[in-house]
């Protein structure tokens, strides 16, 4: 399903802070073990991505290390991580987002603290809506469900890791290759948000002064041969 690299690779995500142009790097801790390790390594390549890239440099490097398609936004992470071949897949990730006039900010999933019971309750309510559009849904863990179906074919998705780094524009969210597909996905996302808005799980969370799950993030879409 993937081709292993010829030699071992060590990838250290988020090792460099994303700072405004001209800003000075803050002081770093000593990290003697990491410094010793780096002394035995050599950089294999430099990745430079545009600010509006739907993936982070780490994700592109990781895709290459696994022998996966490395075009930002087009790496089939869901299919790869779930071990599914021959059908379009994606992750649906329960999240809390805030929609601004021009951009979208996402709360880190860890701050939601969604447990298995609540996640499965949300999935059970969401599943019939997806089934109506020919999509199948499978629970894998509280913060990630696997969705499969033709409606996902050819999607380009902004990764959640990228969105957590800084706000993204609405145009950077999941993009469909055809207008009909795009309309279907927007309708489905709207229906899902309305369902979540009145869901008992969210009613309970709001009583407990916890962030509600108000959206499902689509990411890692693609197909493995």
Predicted feature locations:
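Beta-sheet entry/capping signal
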Residues: 7-9, 136, 144
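Loop-centered beta-sheet repeat module
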Residues: 2, 152-224
